Amino acid sequence: MIEFKNVSKSYSNGTKALDGVNLRIEQGEFVFIVGDSGAGKSTLLKIMMREEVASEGSVVIKNRSLNTMKKRDIPYFRRHLGIVFQDFRLIPNMTVYDNVAFAMRVIGAKEKKISNRVPHVLGRVGLAEKAKCLPNELSGGEQQRVALARAIVNNADIIIADEPTGNVDSKRSFEIVEMLNQINASGTTVIMVTHSEELVRRFGRRIITIKDGKIVSDDISNISVEPIADSQVFGDLDIASKRAIREADEFIRNYNSTIEDITPEQQGGETDEQ
């Protein structure tokens, strides 16, 4: 459960990014967050990730107060989160395999466990044959799949996706959101920021609209109780990719680990593994 009560956020330059936000997201929901650039969407996500702290009000996630959370506890809290960014944030000198494995290594997972899980995860997102590729050898859609695999390899309770379709075409956008849809079907909470009206309209989920730092609309009338047919979303997407998407919810049930911060030192190749 995620709960914001009367949350405001002001920066040192006087900018008020959030103003009296009240919000409750239950475990297992899929929520789209929409709004113009500068509306406050990114600040909302940063507070959820504990990158920022509310100036006023209270924030509780998974029964933990983020306002009073100690710095040493933040990495452990973030292990419950899987983050998917618009710009992918893959480590350029690491292969696809190692980018996903890195999420496990930073929490001290054993190499045997990693060598079993990562190929399985990559297979489920349709990238088994790309395991040895570097990020610059992949298309935008493939890079975003790697980012998604990295976010869910440790079975996060909450997926936070910040414009995950911003750098891919329409067809791949639907593919990525349908993957998130299937992950959500297994009980994972998904929060996705998007500017795409087409995606929001097509996927029939709760829509929270932010304007000038305030929630101006929280619409559940768009929620669909019927699954979306493959032909509506994927068109002529190949069968293997469809199968990979349909199986995405299966593999995340099998894992109980979680993800921690990626530090600059770790990006250089160091890990926390003992």
Predicted regions and their residues:
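Conserved ABC transporter NBD signature motif
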Residues: G57-S65
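Helix-to-loop junction immediately C-terminal to a conserved catalytic motif
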Residues: M49
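A short, proline-enriched helix->beta-strand linker immediately N-terminal to the Walker B motif
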Residues: V153-D157
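Catalytic Walker B motif of ABC-type/P-loop ATPase nucleotide-binding domains
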Residues: I159-D162
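Hydrophobic anchor residue at the start of the ABC signature
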Residues: L148
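Conserved ABC ATPase signature
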Residues: L134-L138, E142
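Short coil-to-helix segment of the ABC ATPase nucleotide-binding domain corresponding to the Q-loop/switch region
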Residues: M94-F102
